[in-house]
Amino acid sequence: QGLIPFPRV
């Protein structure tokens, strides 16, 4: 999901 300005790692 691209709802946050940083990627989920």
UniProtKB/Swiss-Prot annotation:
This is Periviscerokinin-1. Keywords: Amidation, Neuropeptide, Pyrrolidone carboxylic acid, Secreted. The modification Pyrrolidone carboxylic acid is found at Q1. Pfam families: Periviscerokin. GO terms for cellular component: extracellular region. InterPro entries: Periviscerokinin. It is found in: Secreted. It comes from the Eukaryota.
